[in-house]
Amino acid sequence: MDQIVIMWLYIWGNLNEYEKNIVKLLTDNDSLTWNELLDKTKYSKSTLTKYIDSLNNKAIIKYNHNKTYSLNDSMLKTWLKHKKEIEGQYPL
């Protein structure tokens, strides 16, 4: 378990604020469509596409058959929810 946490700390630490925001939204909402992400992030279409592609290429998020995006790893989601519950916010 500790090795998994260390891995996610490293990955989380290497995400930029745009990517972290998308991951936080998917943690809070389970899955969202591209348009829902566009609305919630207030990013431009090109910016959202850029960071969705980046997170997808890093295997952090996945595109589902129902045309939604979600986190690819349930351990990441569990870790982020735990951090938010314990510390009152997501890791910085």
Where are these regions (language model features)?
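Short, amphipathic alpha-helical interaction segments positioned at domain boundaries
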Residues: M75-L92
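Short, Lys/Arg-rich nucleic-acid/phosphate-binding segment
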Residues: N64-S70, S74-M75
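Winged-helix-like regulatory helical subdomains adjacent to P-loop NTPase cores
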Residues: M1-Y43
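Secondary-structure transition/capping residues
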Residues: T33-W34, L48, K62, E87, ...
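Non-catalytic, well-ordered alpha-helical scaffold segments
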Residues: K20, T49, D73-S74
